Structures are given as structure tokens and as C-alpha cells.
Regions:
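Non-transmembrane, aqueous-exposed alpha-helical and coiled segments at domain scale
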Residues: 1-174
Length: 174
């Protein structure tokens, strides 16, 4: 879920590759927050989780691999649903509040889909472009479940994006 959580904040910051994101203090802090506060705690074996995180960060930092965010962004609705949403849902099911960094990542995905050309299912893309956040989140066909409970948080994240810019909104989300 680390790639998926970071892709749209990075693209909205006009950062083109994964390696560049790791060198960017704001994006690196966001990734660290997502990984260590939300993704890793949902994995069963703590030692395996830490080894996984280390391997992910090493792969992301490899200067010989130029993972372009535009390529990673392909089909992001299904990727978010499979890779980030389970962590978000597990966190909330455990009684914790909505994890703002993961909701911010979703707000960035929606903002990107609304404002830029994307390569994804044309029907899904059109639905996002044409509808407000509450309708987008309530659409179980997009996310596999009704995400209406995220409306307030994602709306606030989006307002922060518009009012303060990506970096300040990202800092707020952490």
C-alpha cells in the first residue's frame, strides 16, 4: 500500500519518480507516517512487517530503478481498494478514528482524477469527474463498499488541498 498511498500526493507535488519522492522531505515523512503508523501495525508478524518495510524503502530508494509515478498511477481505483483501503477499514474497525494520511491519499486520488487525464476504467473516471465527493465515496461499485463514513474527512482534506496547497495539506494530515 505504500506506493499507492504516495502516488497522488507525489504527482500533485509534481514529483515524477519514486526515488525523487524519497528525497523530498515532505513526501518521505508522509510515506514514513503511512507505513509505520498505519500499514505495518495491521500486519500480523511484527518482525516480518519491519523487514517488509525495510525492503520496500530500499527498493524505493534504488537509484537505478526509475519507477515513474505516471506508470504506477494506472488503474489506481482498484489499487487503492486492494492495497490501502483494507488498512483504513481495519484501523476504523478497531475503534480508531479515520487515519487522516490514508484519507488524504484518497482525497489526492479523487482530486487528480477530477483535474487531470488518467488511464483507468472510463466509466469510473467519468463518475469521479462528474460527481461530488459524497456521491463518489458512496459508490460501492468504485470501492467495493460504501465509504460514506469518510465523507467529512475526505472533504476536509480536499478543502485543505485547495486552500493551502498539497504540501501544507499533507503536513496537516500527518
Amino acid at each position: 500500500g505504500a506506493h499507492t498511498a504516495l502516488v497522488f500526493p507525489s504527482l500533485l507535488c509534481k514529483v515524477e519518480t519514486v526515488g525523487e519522492s524519497l528525497k523530498d522531505k515532505d513526501l518521505a515523512a508522509f510515506l514514513d507516517c503511512c507505513l509505520h503508523r498505519y500499514i505495518l501495525p495491521t500486519l500480523d508478524n511484527r518482525a516480518e512487517a519491519e523487514a517488509f518495510a525495510k525492503a520496500v524503502l530500499e527498493r524505493f530508494a534504488n537509484p537505478y530503478i526509475h519507477h515513474r509515478w505516471q506508470s504506477i498511477a494506472l488503474n489506481s481505483i482498484s489499487k487503492y481498494t486492494a492495497r490501502v483501503l483494507p488498512t483504513l477499514l481495519d484501523t476504523v474497525a478497531g475503534g480508531a478514528p479515520v487515519p487522516r494520511p490514508l484519507a488524504f491519499s484518497l482525497a489526492c486520488l479523487i482530486e487528480y482524477y477530477k483535474t487531470r487525464p488518467v488511464t483507468d476504467d472510463p466509466k469510473q473516471t467519468a463518475f469521479i469527474k462528474e460527481n461530488p465527493i459524497p456521491a463518489i465515496l458512496a459508490n460501492a461499485e468504485l470501492w467495493g463498499t460504501d465509504l460514506s463514513f469518510l465523507t467529512d474527512t475526505v472533504t476536509i482534506c480536499t478543502e485543505k488541498l485547495h486552500q493551502s496547497g498539497v504540501r501544507e495539506a499533507m503536513q496537516w494530515s500527518m
